[in-house]
From Swiss-Prot:
It catalyses: Endonucleolytic cleavage to 5'-phosphomonoester. Residues 14-236 form the RNase H type-2 domain. Catalytic subunit of RNase HII, an endonuclease that specifically degrades the RNA of RNA:DNA hybrids. Participates in DNA replication, possibly by mediating the removal of lagging-strand Okazaki fragment RNA primers during DNA replication. Mediates the excision of single ribonucleotides from DNA:RNA duplexes. Manganese or magnesium. Binds 1 divalent metal ion per monomer in the absence of substrate. May bind a second metal ion after substrate binding. The keyword Ribonucleoprotein does not apply. NCBIfam families: ribonuclease HII. InterPro entries: RNase_H2_suA, RNase_HII/HIII, RNase_HII/HIII_dom, RNase_HII_hlx-loop-hlx_cap_dom, RNaseH-like_sf, RNaseH_sf. Its cofactor is Mn(2+); Mg(2+). It comes from the Eukaryota. Its EC number is 3.1.26.4. This is Ribonuclease H2 subunit A. Belongs to the RNase HII family. Eukaryotic subfamily.
Length: 296
C-alpha cells in the first residue's frame, strides 16, 4: 500500500475521507483502491479544484489533477494496489473470497491506515459495492466513530470521492505502463487495450499470449470467466486430487472446486494409465502430487 508518508499538521482536526476504486472489471492488471482525505473545514474548497469522476476525464487531465492534489498541503491520499495474482488466488481458493469482500477489505484497510497515522476521521464517503445499506452497516460496525455515506455514483456526487477516483485511476494506469512482466521467456507486448473483456484489443492480446499448458502471463486474472472460455480445448491435465475425490476418498462434504471448472481441461485417462503416485517415485514428487504424463 502506498500513501503520503507524513502525518499532516491538520490531522487532529475533524476530517472527511472519500474512497473509490479503479480496475474492478478488467481481466488483467491490478485493482486499485484509492482514498483522499482533508479537514472538514477545507470541504468547501474542494469544488474549486475541479475534481470529477475519473472515467469522464481524459488521461492528460487526470494526470494534471493528480499532480496538483499531491502538492496541496490540505489534502492527504493513499492507495491499495491489489495484484492480479492475489485476486485470482483469493477467488479460486478452497475458502473463496469474492470480489465484493476483497473490495470491502481494501476500503477498510485504507481507513485503518489513515486512522493509524493519527488522522481524526469523522466522515467517510464511498461508492457502493453491493447493497449500499448493508455496506454502510458493515463499515459502521468496524469503525463506529465515523459517519459513513455509501452511495451509487458517489464519484460523481461528492468531490472528495472524485479526488479518490482520480488517485486510484492514475495509480492503476501508471502501474500497467510500468508493469514488470515476469514471463521473460515469452515475447509479450503491451498492446492490451483497456483490459476489459469486451475490448477487441484485449481479446486479441489474450489470444496472442495464451499458452496451451500454463494459460496466461501473471498480468491476467485467471479467476475471470473470460479466461475459462479462452482455455477450453487446451492441453488436458490429470489432477490426482480430482481423481481421489471421484473415487469417494474426499472427506469433506464441501469440496474444493476442480481446476477443470476454471478452464483447465481434465484428462480422461484413468490413474492406472499414468505413472503411479506411490511406490518408486521420489518423496518430493509424491508430496506435491506431481505425476508424469506420457503424452499430451
Amino acid at each position: 500500500m502506498e500513501s503520503e508518508c507524513l502525518t499532516p499538521e491538520w490531522a487532529s482536526q475533524p476530517c472527511l475521507m472519500g474512497i473509490d476504486e479503479a480496475g474492478r472489471g478488467p481481466v488483467l492488471g491490478p485493482m486499485v483502491y484509492g482514498c483522499m482525505y482533508c479537514p472538514i473545514s477545507y470541504q468547501s474548497s474542494l469544488a474549486s479544484l475541479h475534481f470529477a469522476d475519473s472515467k469522464t476525464l481524459k488521461e492528460e487531465k487526470r494526470e494534471e489533477l493528480y499532480e496538483s492534489l499531491k502538492l496541496d498541503k490540505s489534502l492527504g491520499w493513499a492507495v491499495d494496489v491489489i495484484d492480479p495474482r492475489e485476486l485470482s488466488a483469493k477467488m479460486l481458493a478452497k475458502n473463496k473470497t469474492n470480489l465484493n469482500e476483497i473490495s470491502h477489505n481494501s476500503a477498510m484497510g485504507l481507513i485503518k491506515r489513515v486512522l493509524d497515522m493519527g488522522v481524526l476521521l469523522t466522515e467517510a464517503y464511498l461508492d457502493t459495492v453491493g447493497d449500499p445499506d448493508k455496506y454502510r452497516i458493515k463499515l459502521s460496525e468496524r469503525f463506529p466513530s465515523i459517519k459513513f455515506v455509501v452511495s451509487k455514483k458517489a464519484d460523481s456526487l461528492f468531490p472528495i470521492v472524485s479526488g479518490a477516483s482520480i488517485v486510484a485511476k492514475v495509480t492503476r494506469d501508471r502501474a500497467l505502463k510500468e508493469w514488470l512482466v515476469e514471463e521473460t521467456g515469452e515475447d509479450i507486448n503491451r498492446n492490451f487495450g483497456s483490459g476489459y473483456p469486451g475490448d477487441p484489443e484485449t481479446k486479441a492480446w489474450l489470444v496472442q499470449h495464451k499458452h496451451s499448458v500454463f494459460g496466461f502471463p501473471s498480468l491476467v486474472r485467471f479467476s475471470w470467466g473470460t479466461c475459462t472460455t479462452h482455455l477450453k480445448g487446451e492441453v488436458e491435465v490429470a489432477w490426482e486430487a480430482d481423481e481421489n475425490e471421484e473415487s469417494g476418498n474426499g472427506s469433506s462434504s464441501k469440496r474444493q472446486a476442480k481446476l477443470s471448472s476454471f478452464g483447465f481441461k481434465t484428462c480422461e485417462k484413468r490413474s492406472e494409465e499414468i505413472e503411479s503416485s506411490g511406490k518408486g517415485r521420489c518423496k518430493f514428487l509424491q508430496a506435491r502430487k506431481i505425476q508424469q504424463l506420457t503424452q499430451f
